[in-house]
Amino acid sequence: RQQLAELPPTEREQVLLALVRESATTVLGHAPSTQIDSDQPFKELGFDSLTGIELRNLLQAKTGASLPASVVFDYPDPETLANGLGAILFPPTEPSNRSAGLISTSHHDLFGELYLRAMENGQLAHAQELMLSGAQLRAKFHDPAELDAAPSVVRIGSAQQGPHMICVCPTVMTTGPQVYTRFAEQFTDGWTVSALVPPGFDGGEALPATREALVRSLADSVEDYVGDSELSLVGHSSGGVVAYELAKELQGRGLDPTAVVLIDSYSFDGDGGRPEEMFRNALNARMIEYLRWASGDKLSERITAQVWSLELLRGWRPEGLSAPTLYVRPIQPLVEEEKPEWRGDVISMMTSVADVPGDHFTILEGEHVGSTARVVDHWLRNLR
């Protein structure tokens, strides 16, 4: 970093760009002589959520900058990433709008670390209380017009035409477009697949004060993104709950979604047959594992946003939507103590139900994501 500081700004930009291109080549396993164009999208180069984090970790190790796990989505090509890297390493002397997705290199997140430590020690209730108290102190918005920036919609699929499939990211601390990258990769044609990221999870973003504020902010972004084009909504876990409520809001605006797909979504009121604390511990264990690997990602902001958002979704029931709905149910329980009927109150309100191999997480990962995507694709095509 000191060596970079001694360079003139123009030369520094070139060095950072070369560093990004070289690091991308290394992560992809290409020969050192391989040339990557500065404006070539990372998606076209073959980056996914895992290789994106590898690139992020490599750049952090080389520069000391703290970058988000979703870096290849926030900064879609080497030149854009190099510019963002320069902005955080050498910020302007005058105050300016923060660089989206980047945080201070000197910040130590004690609050977030306390939460992770409590979760690792099995102190779920204490961890939740701690972060809910923090969430209550964060800035809130009641009207989407109060936001500095609208929730982002990020193209994650390779197809450039076809009806829109908007995947609503879950309201959890690991949220981001990377949740759906493997799912989106399965749709090589026929659908324009994008991810919609909820507000409040990035540094400095306000939290929605109410469920209505959350849904309206997302609806504004979707309306701007798709116009009057055909669209379907997909959501995994809490993302499915938000997708359902978002569809109702769009329906009220005269922008009727073709369909809504809920991938193992559920209400948050301790449904009968689900061992609530064990289930939540299993969910959090997986997310903590990810955050430990992708450390430095604004833990306090992300965790308080998760706790607050899930509070907003309490009491949810799938009612008031005219669009057809599909519930995708994993056949493998997340914890052995689950009873198969605990999803009943949600499933009973769905148009269709499809069982797929895997558990709550693996239905969107590895060998099982293909089965999930095929079920969704087949069901949506039959509606057309």
Can you describe what each PLM-predicted range is?
Residues 1, 60-65, 352-353:
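Short acidic (Asp/Glu) and glycine-rich catalytic loops that position anionic groups and cofactors
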Residues 18, 99-384:
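A hydrolase-biased, glycine/serine/histidine/acidic-enriched motif that marks catalytic-domain neighborhoods
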Residues 5, 37, 43, 51, ...:
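Generic, ordered loop/turn and secondary-structure boundary motif
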Residues 1-12:
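Glycine-rich phosphate/pyrophosphate-binding loop
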Residues 7-8, 42-43, 234, 303:
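Short, contiguous strand/loop micro-motifs
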Residues 1, 33-36, 224-226:
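A short alpha-helix capping/helix-coil boundary motif
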Residues 10, 14-141, 265-270, 370-373:
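Phosphopantetheine-dependent thiolation modules in NRPS/PKS and related acyl-activating systems
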